[in-house]
UniProtKB/Swiss-Prot annotation:
It is found in: Cytoplasm. The gene is apt. Transmembrane segments: none annotated. It is an enzyme of class 2 (transferase). It comes from the Bacteria. PANTHER family: ADENINE PHOSPHORIBOSYLTRANSFERASE. Belongs to the purine/pyrimidine phosphoribosyltransferase family. This is Adenine phosphoribosyltransferase. The lineage of its organism: Bacteria, Bacillati, Bacillota, Bacilli, Bacillales. It comes from Geobacillus kaustophilus (strain HTA426). Disulfide bonds: none annotated.
């Protein structure tokens, strides 16, 4: 299935010059959303995934149905102050400034095989920070899965050494 036909390109969103890739038109098409999810599930099975991790919010949209299909848990990665129990945290650089991501300290067991999911691989900053959280907890990042990769932004360079699945490239 050609998933690109289900992605809507929105010019000048969220700011002028950006060509936003809207995944909601893929998600609201049942067969396309199922196909995309099934592709990631197949990849995850090959990697013997024990838990799925995803950064908020669109990583949840991808990761939760994958975890469900695999019969494994899902561990959310959230911005600081959003998780109620003890967390590990990582600060990472943005274009202008820094941000912080957190994860419950007991979310990953040492040695557990982890799939990290997100909607989009752009610069790789959020994914690199998520990897750092998983590895702080002793998890083994067995794979990274994205719906979309924006190849011109070079995010793969920050993720060298990790196995990456992308369903579409722009």
């Amino acid at each position: 299935m050609d998933l690109k036909q289900y992605i809507t390109i929105v010019p000048d969103f969220p700011k002028p010059g950006i060509m936003f890739k809207d995944i909601t038109t893929l998600m609201d098409n049942g067969p396309a959303y199922k196909y995309a999810t099934d592709q990631i599930v197949q990849y995850a099975r090959e990697k013997q995934i024990e838990i799925v991790v995803g950064p908020e919010a669109r990583g949840f949209i991808i990761g939760c149905p994958v975890a469900y299909a695999l019969g494994v848990g899902f561990a959310p990665v959230r911005k600081e102050g959003k998780l109620p129990r003890e967390v590990v945290r990582v600060e990472y650089g943005l274009e202008y400034g820094t941000d912080v991501l957190t994860m419950h300290k007991d979310a990953i067991k040492p040695g557990q095989r982890v799939l990290i999911t997100d909607d989009l691989l752009a610069t790789g900053g959020t994914m690199r920070a998520t990897i750092d959280l998983v590895e702080q907890l002793g998890g083994v990042v067995a794979g990274l899965a994205f719906l979309i990769e924006l190849t011109e932004l070079g995010g793969r360079k920050k993720l060298e050494g990790y196995d990456i699945l992308t369903l579409m490239q722009f």
